Every structure is written in structure tokens, then in C-alpha cells.
Amino acid sequence: ISGKSMIERLLLELSPLVAQVVVIRAPGQTIPNIPKELKDRTLLGWDSVKDRGPLQGIVDALPLLNAEIDKVFLLTCDLPYITTNWFQNLKDVMTDEFDMVCTEENEIVNPLLAIYRRPVLEPASKLISAGKRRPISLWEGWRMARLSAPNETPWICRDVNTPEEFKKAKT
């Protein structure tokens, strides 16, 4: 999109707001192009067990993340419309009264376009051991705020799941 991969574009939009980035990829997946302004604060990892989904990514990412970082963006890589302003909105809503802020579209909450307090993510390994695979399993007992896309830009939080959606995102 505009000459950049979706992950590269996502990282560029996120970069002004974060001290560190951890990118987790599936075993055998190509190493993404990391923007030069992020190279010194980006770590690459991979799923230590394949086909376990986002929870495995969380398990493998947390040890790579600086221990002082308490608020963690958890993002899917296929967000072609996302902006720095949207990430800032998520961050602004994350006040002391919430443990996570997730985006919501048509009453569907997206756990992979969200910001979490680190303790919310730490039980991921136990959930995998219990046979869970979905990040929503992390939510129980925590306080969540939901943030919907503005009416003037309803597409901002949409991800890409089909070749047709990808083609549309490139235009």
C-alpha cells in the first residue's frame, strides 16, 4: 500500500507512540521490512509453537518486551487504514479506570486492535495450556473500554481478510 507492506505501514503509524516494538511471525514467515526509524527499538520473534494463534504470539512476545513497559498495543498486521491518531485515541482512553481498550465495529470487539495493561496479557500461557486459543479468553475479570471508529472514517479499524479487500485497500 503506497509502496509499503501492511506491516511496514502499521509500524510507521505506531512508531511515534511507542518505546519498543515486538513483531512475532509464524515459523518460516518472511522477515518483514522494519522502517529505519524503528530498527533500533524493534525485536523480531516467532511463534515457538505453530498454529496456536494470537495467544501463542502473546506468550512469545512478552519476554522480548522491556519489563518497564506496562501498556502494550496488541495488533494484527493487516490494518491498512489505521493511523497514528487512532492509536493515540486508544492510548488516551486507557485511563486508570481501564485495563484494556479494544476497538469495536458493529458491536464486534476486536482484541487484536487494542491496548492492554501488561498483567492482562500475562495469563496467555496458562490459557493455551487449558486449550484456549482466542485472545478474548484474557478478558475475564478485567475492565474494558470499547472504542468505535468515528462516523466520518468508519473504515479506519477494518482489517483485510480477502484478496478483494486487499485490492480495495491498495486504491
Where are the predicted features?
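Nucleotide and nucleotide-moiety/phosphate-recognizing core
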Residues: 1-132, 140-156, 163-164
